[in-house]
Amino acid sequence: MNNDNLHDKLTIWRQQQIELKGMLQLIPKFQSLNEIRYVVGLDISFDKSSPKAVSALVIYDLEQRMIIYKDYLCIEKLEEDYVPGFLSFREIKWYLPLLNHIPHQFRIDIILVDGNGVLHPVGFGLACHLGVLLNLPVVGVAKNYLHCVGLTESLDAHRETLKKHVLKKTTDHPILIHSIDQSSEILGAAVWTSSNSKRPVYVSIGNQMNLEQSIQLVQKCSSSHSRVPEPIRQADIYAKFVLSQSKRNKKN
């Protein structure tokens, strides 16, 4: 795709994000985290040697600490390249069939997805996009920091912030991520999910949640095994397993 076509596409996508942002619901659905039991985790695993990928969904029973349902979708080729700030247009179409295919006997309380929510250049990341389309509570949990030019501190500055925080041994408290403009709006948080975590995950509101609830839920869903909360971690493990089995079967 040439630069002109890409620019036109991104302009259309940005307009869609801005329009859909008006449908965000930032008033929490839940009065207490005790109302949340069934947590959907979503992730995509990519084959490093081919265009193939696998999207995976798990339903995690937070009370029993176990997976009660899982599904996957094999992707021959992702149709869009990754462009920072436009992840939803690359990945959301591979999540929606899985979400729409969940049997009716399973209840969904909330979704955790590998990606950002309002911590985003226009405040409408993948987690927000999913939440608006499905009218469900969603929390964005990104593994890496997304620098939003003119909105959040640079990557180098953020690394210094993390370093100081770790040296103070205050990783049991999240770092709130503020916008650097005059509003100083809180966009999300860098969260260490356990005492074993060397790096944080980046938590932000997707839909029908507030940030305090979102942070508490991510911590509640996490274990000492990984900095990534279990619903997303288990979806990632499952996607990688399906991808490896597919490659093994092809060789045989």
UniProtKB/Swiss-Prot annotation:
GO CC terms, sorted: cytoplasm; cytosol; nucleolus; nucleus
Binding residues for Mg(2+): D43, D114
Single GO BP term: DNA repair
UniProt keyword list: Cytoplasm, Endonuclease, Hydrolase, Magnesium, Metal-binding, Nuclease, Nucleus
Entry GO MF terms: metal ion binding; RNA endonuclease activity, producing 5'-phosphomonoesters; single-stranded RNA binding
EC number: 3.1.-.-
Family: Belongs to the endonuclease V family.
Protein name listed in UniProt: Putative endonuclease C1F12.06c
Organism whose genome encodes this protein: Schizosaccharomyces pombe (strain 972 / ATCC 24843)
Record lineage: Eukaryota, Fungi, Dikarya, Ascomycota, Taphrinomycotina
